[in-house]
């Protein structure tokens, strides 16, 4: 067979023994969570059927539970948050329609260009504060209808914001953005991969953050510890259209109850423990602030993400590699930052262990002049 010509891409999914070693403290992401024992049992015992025919009882039960708990008319299980976001684009927009979005939004930065390659939308970047688009900037970006312009269609929010260091879009800010969108007849989608963190940080029920949007994605693989899956939620009419788009992009599933079973357990056991992860992140930030070479303002940590400036120690890629060799796995954010994320399976002992190892690495790097 002939090969496909074009650029090569690094393999990111190859098993790395340094990451999976029992002694490693993996703070790379909250996607590193593993299914709980109750999830594993639920997967084994779940009643199953063919979800493509709407006959998997566990999927049907989970979607009903999720819609009720999240305060929406309907919910649909999909394979990933990226797929849920893509489906939302396909339902809300037609090719060339205009999407108003922050430059660092996950859908722009980390979803392989699907918004252009598959959905064919026209992104218009709107000024933001820590990733959250500003209402006045959105107002200024929306143009009067004209044959020279794409059709304005969708406003995209992300809460919490990944590249905004896990920052929270507070309720009054979100409502102001929603009001501008409504004024111009635009739909609003919320990338709520970590919306449970956003709600917990504000002392709100998650329903309040989903109440003013037309659709939202909620990821199951982060703080909720599921092995895969996400929810797309919205009105019954929206989800009816979304089921067709899910099939279109290859997301139709058969005995998907094994995924839904984990989601049911997550909703029963884990929805109310999110603040534990935030407290762990604050302990981590406080400890790092006292180590020479790690620059961080602990007050900047709003949820479970800790972004640290390591420029004083060298390039972030080199610092991340040194930490990995010491058994602390972090995410590299070149050229100066690393990211650490707390989650269900990061214990207090792990936080203390990570701080000790990181202090040793910092001391070693300070003693070794950069080449």
Regions found by a protein language model. Name each.
Residues 3-6:
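Residue-identity detector for glycine
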Residues 12-14, 18-311, 316-326, 331-346, ...:
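Conserved PLP-enzyme active-site core in the AAT-like
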């Amino acid at each position: 067979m002939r090969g496909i010509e074009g650029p090569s891409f690094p393999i990111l999914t190859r098993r790395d023994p340094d990451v999976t070693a029992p002694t490693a403290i993996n703070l790379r992401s909250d996607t590193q969570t593993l299914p709980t024992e109750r999830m594993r049992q639920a997967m084994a015992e779940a009643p199953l059927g063919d979800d493509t025919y709407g006959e998997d009882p566990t999927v049907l039960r989970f979607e009903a539970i999720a819609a009720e708990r999240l305060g929406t008319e309907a919910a649909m299980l999909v394979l990933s948050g990226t797929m849920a976001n893509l489906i939302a684009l396909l339902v809300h927009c037609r090719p060339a329609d205009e999407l108003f979005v922050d430059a660092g939004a996950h859908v722009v930065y980390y979803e392989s260009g699907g918004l252009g390659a598959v959905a064919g939308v026209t992104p218009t970047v709107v000024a933001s504060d820590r990733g959250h688009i500003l209402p006045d900037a959105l107002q200024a970006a929306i143009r009067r209808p004209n044959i020279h312009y794409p059709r304005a269609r969708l406003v995209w929010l992300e809460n919490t914001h990944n590249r905004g260091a896990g920052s929270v879009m507070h309720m009054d800010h979100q409502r102001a953005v929603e009001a501008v969108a409504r004024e111009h007849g635009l739909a609003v989608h919320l990338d709520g991969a970590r919306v449970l963190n956003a709600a917990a940080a504000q002392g709100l029920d998650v329903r309040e953050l989903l109440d003013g949007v037309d659709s939202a994605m909620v990821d199951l693989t982060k703080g909720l510890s599921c092995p895969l899956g996400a929810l797309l939620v919205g009105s019954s009419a929206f989800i009816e259209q979304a089921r067709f788009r899910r099939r279109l992009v290859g997301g139709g599933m058969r005995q998907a109850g094994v995924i839904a079973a984990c989601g049911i357990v997550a909703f029963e056991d884990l929805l109310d423990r999110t603040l534990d992860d935030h407290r762990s992140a604050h302990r981590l930030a406080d400890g790092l602030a006292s180590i020479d070479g790690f620059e961080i303002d602990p007050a900047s940590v709003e949820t479970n993400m800790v972004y640290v400036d390591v420029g004083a120690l060298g390039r972030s890629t080199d610092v991340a590699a040194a930490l990995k060799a010491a058994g602390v796995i972090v995410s590299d954010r070149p050229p100066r930052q690393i990211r650490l994320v707390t989650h269900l399976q990061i214990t207090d002992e792990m936080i203390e262990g990570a701080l000790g190892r990181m202090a040793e690495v910092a001391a070693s790097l300070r003693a070794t002049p950069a080449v």
